[in-house]
């Protein structure tokens, strides 16, 4: 589709090249599911969905159902954003979004969909949405969690161990976690 001329645009935004950015947050954390966020910088519109923690627990984890669910979530988010015909779709290079990239290319056309490193507001808003999700569980994340990933993991683990019923909020499918989840 040809880009409209300035004279044919009803708003400045209509003539501006728009971009959708898709990011994830929480994949490497022990608690909750994973947030998939979508952000359009030109309008500052942000939306997200959560891939439930059940996808990171057996038996779904072994089947890698989280990859298919991430693709479904990404497709729903893009569709609800009503992208223009030539609007670029940038997707985080995270492994969890690999299937999403392929599905988006099939649905919206390969040249429009690019795998990139997501930074800035898209990343910040997706991370903030994830932090809100874990706070809803009653967990208070450490302030410097990004800089101190190992400390953050063990802080989450101690929180789970204080109350065995919290285990239902943990991503127990990761093989390396099994050695830490013992009660």
Predicted ranges, named:
Residues 2-183:
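RNase H-like, Mg2+-dependent phosphodiesterase core
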């Amino acid at each position: 589709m040809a880009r409209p001329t300035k004279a044919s645009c009803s708003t400045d935004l209509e003539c501006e090249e728009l971009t959708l950015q898709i990011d994830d947050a929480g994949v490497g954390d022990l608690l909750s599911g994973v947030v998939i966020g979508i952000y359009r910088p030109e309008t500052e519109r942000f939306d997200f969905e959560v891939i439930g923690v059940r996808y990171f627990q057996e038996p779904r984890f072994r089947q890698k159902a989280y990859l298919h669910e991430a693709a479904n979530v990404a497709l729903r988010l893009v569709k609800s954003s009503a992208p223009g015909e030539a609007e670029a779709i940038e997707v985080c290079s995270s492994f969890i979004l690999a299937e999403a990239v392929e599905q988006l290319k099939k649905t919206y056309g390969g040249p429009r969909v690019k795998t990139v490193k997501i930074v800035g507001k898209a990343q910040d808003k997706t991370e903030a949405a994830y932090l809100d999700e874990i706070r809803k569980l009653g967990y208070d994340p450490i302030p410097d969690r990004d800089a101190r990933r190992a400390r953050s993991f063990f802080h989450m683990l101690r929180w789970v161990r204080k109350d065995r019923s919290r285990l239902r909020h943990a991503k127990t499918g990761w093989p390396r976690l099994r050695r830490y989840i013992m009660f």
